[in-house]
UniProtKB/Swiss-Prot annotation:
One GO term describing the cellular component: contractile vacuole
Source lineage: Eukaryota, Amoebozoa, Evosea, Eumycetozoa, Dictyostelia
Coiled coil (residue ranges): 54-104
Keyword annotations of the record: Coiled coil, Cytoplasm, GTPase activation, Membrane, Vacuole
Name of the protein in question: Drainin
Record keyword Transit peptide present: no
Lineage: superkingdom: Eukaryota
Subcellular location: Contractile vacuole membrane; Cytoplasm
Encoding gene, per UniProt annotation: phgA
Primary location class: membrane
Length: 438
C-alpha cells in the first residue's frame, strides 16, 4: 500500500487494518498527473499500529513498484494529452490561417468578378476553396450569389409583407390565441389542430375554390401560420439561446418567416422553415435572409417539398432509394426487409437542409457545398450519413432506425470523417436526373 509523508497522511489508532489513508484529493492528483505529491516514505512501517509488526522488505519493494507504476502511467497520460492538445492547436491555427488567406482570395479575386459577370467566375477555384469551408466574413455574400434572385425580391417588397405579418402577429398574440399557444407545450393536440387548420385554409385558397371570403381566408391563413411559427421557434437551435423569446434574433426570425408566409400564401409555413431562416440570419442581415429564403425555397429541387407536391416528392424519394441500392446494397436490402425508405429521413433533411440533424458547424459546411455544388450534394450528404451510421442501421429494427434518425442531433459526429465519407461518394448529376425522370 502507498503511504504518505506525515504532512498528508494520518493513522487511525483504532483501525486495525494495515492500510494507510489516502488524501481526499488522491484521484485528482493521479488524474492530473501531480503524482510527485505522493511520497513513499521509507519509514512507512512506523505508521502501522504498534501492535502490528513492521513491513517486510518485500512489502516495501512492492509498494515502491506500485508507486512508480502510478507515476509512469500518469506521466504517459500527460504526455499523450499534451501531444493531442498540441496537434489540435496546430490544426486550429492552420485553419485560421487558411481562412484568412481564403477570405482575401474571395474578396479580391472571386466575388468582384462574380458580381460583375457570373459567367466569368472561376468555377474550379470556387469549388476547391469551398471544400475547405467558406470564411464566415464572406459566407453570407457567397450564399446570396449562389442562390441568386430570380424572384426579384427587394427590400421594399420585404417591408410591405412585413407589415402584413405584423397584423397577423398582433392577431396571433391576442389573449385567446396567446393562451392556446402558451399551453401548447402541455397539450400536443394544439400542434396537430393548427396544422390541420393550416391544410384546410390552404385548400380554401386553391385556384379551384370560388369563395368570396378571400380576404378573411388570407388573414386566417396568416394567423394560423404565425401561430405555427411561434411554436416551432422554441425548438430552433435551442442550445444557442438566440432565437427563443428574449434572444437577440428572436424578433428577426419572426419577421423573416412572417413576411414569407404573407408573401407566399400558396406555400405558407412548413415545418423546417424556422431552421432555414435561422441559418440565413446567422450569416446575413434580415432583408437578405428574406431574399435568400424566398429564392431558396423556390428552386426546382426544394419547391416540391414545401408545396407538399404529392406528384413531385415521390420522384426524389425513389431516386434516393435507388441511389442507396446502387451504392450501398446491403443497407438497402436491410431497409427493404424492415420497411425503411427515403420517406423516413429525406424529407426532414431536405426541408431543413440538414441544419436540424447535424451539428451547426457541420451543417454550415454542408450548406456551403450544397449552394456551390448543386442539389446533387444533398444526396451525397444523405447517403454519407447513412454510411456513417451503417453499423448501427444495418442491424436495427424499424423503430430503432426511426429513433436514430430522430436523435441524430444528440449523436457525436466527426466532421472530418463525415466529409471523408462524402468525398468517397461519386454521384453523377445527369444520371441522377434520369432517375428523377422515371
Amino acid at each position: 500500500m502507498i503511504c504518505f509523508d506525515n504532512s498528508t497522511a494520518h493513522t487511525d489508532s483504532n483501525n486495525n487494518n494495515n492500510q494507510c489513508d489516502l488524501p481526499e484529493n488522491y484521484k485528482e492528483l493521479v488524474t492530473t498527473g501531480k503524482v510527485e505529491k505522493l511520497i513513499l516514505s521509507p519509514s512507512s512501517s512506523l505508521d502501522r499500529p504498534k501492535t502490528l509488526p513492521p513491513k517486510s522488505q518485500e512489502e516495501v519493494l512492492k509498494h515502491q513498484r506500485e508507486y512508480e507504476e502510478i507515476q509512469r502511467k500518469a506521466k504517459k497520460t500527460l504526455e499523450r494529452e499534451a501531444k493531442e492538445k498540441e496537434k489540435l492547436d496546430a490544426i486550429r491555427k492552420e485553419k485560421e490561417r487558411s481562412l484568412i488567406d481564403a477570405r482575401k482570395v474571395w474578396e479580391e479575386d472571386i466575388i468582384p468578378v462574380w458580381e460583375k459577370n457570373s459567367k466569368k467566375r472561376d468555377i474550379k477555384k470556387i469549388k476547391d476553396l469551398s471544400w475547405r469551408g467558406l470564411p464566415p466574413a464572406v459566407r453570407g455574400k457567397i450564399w446570396r450569389l449562389c442562390i441568386g434572385n430570380d424572384l426579384r425580391v427587394t427590400d421594399e417588397l420585404f417591408n410591405i409583407f412585413l407589415g402584413h405579418a405584423n397584423n397577423a402577429y398582433n392577431k396571433t398574440t391576442s389573449p385567446p390565441l396567446k393562451s392556446s399557444l402558451s399551453s401548447s407545450s402541455k397539450s400536443p393536440n394544439i400542434n396537430i389542430d393548427l396544422r390541420q387548420a393550416n391544410n384546410s385554409i390552404h385548400h380554401s385558397r386553391s385556384p379551384m375554390n370560388t369563395s368570396t371570403d378571400g380576404e378573411d381566408d388570407v388573414l386566417d391563413l396568416e394567423t394560423t401560420n404565425m401561430a405555427l411559427i411561434l411554436q416551432d421557434i422554441q425548438d430552433t437551435f435551442p442550445s444557442l439561446m438566440i432565437f427563443q423569446k428574449g434572444g437577440p434574433l428572436h424578433s428577426d426570425l419572426i419577421d423573416v418567416l412572417g413576411a414569407y408566409i404573407c408573401y407566399r400564401p400558396d406555400i405558407g409555413y412548413v415545418p423546417g422553415m424556422t431552421f432555414l431562416a435561422a441559418m440565413f440570419l446567422l450569416n446575413m442581415e434580415k432583408c437578405d435572409a428574406f431574399l435568400s429564403l424566398s429564392n431558396h425555397i423556390n428552386s426546382v429541387c426544394f419547391l416540391p417539398f414545401f408545396r407538399q407536391d404529392q406528384s413531385g416528392i415521390p420522384k426524389y424519394l425513389a431516386a434516393m432509394d435507388s441511389t442507396v441500392e446502387a451504392l450501398t446494397p446491403p443497407l438497402h436490402k436491410h431497409f427493404k426487409e424492415i420497411g425503411i425508405s427515403a420517406k423516413n429521413y429525406l424529407v426532414d433533411w431536405i426541408t431543413t437542409l440538414f441544419s436540424k440533424a447535424l451539428p451547426l458547424d457541420v451543417a454550415t459546411r454542408i450548406w456551403d457545398l450544397v449552394f456551390i455544388e448543386g442539389e446533387i450534394f444533398i444526396y451525397r450528404t444523405a447517403l454519407s450519413i447513412l454510411r456513417y451510421f451503417i453499423s448501427d442501421l444495418i442491424q436495427a429494427t424499424y423503430d430503432e432506425c426511426i429513433d436514430l434518425f430522430n436523435k441524430l442531433p444528440q449523436r457525436k459526429i466527426s466532421e472530418d470523417k463525415l466529409f471523408e465519407e462524402i468525398q468517397s461518394i461519386v454521384l453523377d448529376q445527369r444520371k441522377f436526373d434520369k432517375l428523377l425522370e422515371k
